[in-house]
């Protein structure tokens, strides 16, 4: 009984925080599907990630707020015409996602060969045969509460993003991934350092203080022998 009361109290507390969250209110007002858009916005404003003419891939895109922000930023370019983005955003997720204007969405698991091939074809068409400028990954596993298992799952998703970036990024491209502070965090950072010349942690204000969520940014691929 006490456990049920505790869980109900937690749910009520979360709901209260969510309703009164300024980023939730801002997302509703500005038409973003999730408050996560402001995490990317803050990092982008700090690091100037999204530039006119870029090809951007959003891994684990659903519900779509990162794709929305990237698309809007490209559409705000002085070179953009008719409200269309100057560049391209390609989003992929295992989960379904409501369409985002001017964003190409692929539903599927990019670890599967046919889905990966489809993603490559879409990217090649968008980039004119060139490589990608920016890879975004807000992917997160279903957490079990078992620290060792959760760390392994988080590291695995980061590895997937790193492998994808290594193959498809331009030499001066960038990769931004979500991860969590925990037992595997330092290993993820080391993997980034082996692959990128510049590596930086980011904890935007829109990321809740209570959360161990953080982001790692890698820029400028190292030459892999």
Curated annotation (Swiss-Prot):
The active site is at 178 (proton acceptor). The keyword rRNA processing applies. GO terms for cellular component: cytoplasm. It catalyses: uridine(2552) in 23S rRNA + S-adenosyl-L-methionine = 2'-O-methyluridine(2552) in 23S rRNA + S-adenosyl-L-homocysteine + H(+). InterPro entries: RNA_methyltr_RlmE, RNA_MeTrfase_FtsJ_dom, rRNA-MeTfrase_E, SAM-dependent_MTases_sf. It comes from the Bacteria. It is an enzyme of class 2 (transferase). It holds the Pfam family FtsJ. Its main location: cytoplasm. Its EC number is 2.1.1.166. It is found in: Cytoplasm. Keywords: Cytoplasm, Methyltransferase, rRNA processing, S-adenosyl-L-methionine, Transferase. One of its GO terms (molecular function) is rRNA (uridine-2'-O-)-methyltransferase activity. S-adenosyl-L-methionine binds at residues 64, 66, 93, 109, 138. Gene3D superfamilies: Vaccinia Virus protein VP39 (3.40.50.150). Belongs to the class I-like SAM-binding methyltransferase superfamily. RNA methyltransferase RlmE family. Specifically methylates the uridine in position 2552 of 23S rRNA at the 2'-O position of the ribose in the fully assembled 50S ribosomal subunit. This is Ribosomal RNA large subunit methyltransferase E. The lineage of its organism: Bacteria, Pseudomonadati, Pseudomonadota, Betaproteobacteria, Burkholderiales.
């Amino acid at each position: 009984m006490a456990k049920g009361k505790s869980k109900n109290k937690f749910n009520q507390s979360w709901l209260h925080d969510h309703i009164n969250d300024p980023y939730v209110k801002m997302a509703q007002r500005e038409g973003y599907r999730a408050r996560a858009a402001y995490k990317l916005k803050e990092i982008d404003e700090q690091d100037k990630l999204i530039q006119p003419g870029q090809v951007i891939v959003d891994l684990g895109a659903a519900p779509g707020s990162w794709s929305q922000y990237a698309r809007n930023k490209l559409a705000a370019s002085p070179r953009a015409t008719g409200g269309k983005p100057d560049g391209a955003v390609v989003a992929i997720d295992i989960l379904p996602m409501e369409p985002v204007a001017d964003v190409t969405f692929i539903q599927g698991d990019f670890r599967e060969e046919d889905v990966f091939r489809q993603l490559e074809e879409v990217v090649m068409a968008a980039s004119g045969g060139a490589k990608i400028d920016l890879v975004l990954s807000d992917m997160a596993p279903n957490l079990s509460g078992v620290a060792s298992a959760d760390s392994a799952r988080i590291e695995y998703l980061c590895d997937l993003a790193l492998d994808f970036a290594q193959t498809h990024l331009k030499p001066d491209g960038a990769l931004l991934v979500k991860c969590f502070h925990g037992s595997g965090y330092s290993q993820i950072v080391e993997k980034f350092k082996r692959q990128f010349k510049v590596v930086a942690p980011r904890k935007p204000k829109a990321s809740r203080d209570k959360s161990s969520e953080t982001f790692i940014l890698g820029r400028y691929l190292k030459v892999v022998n």
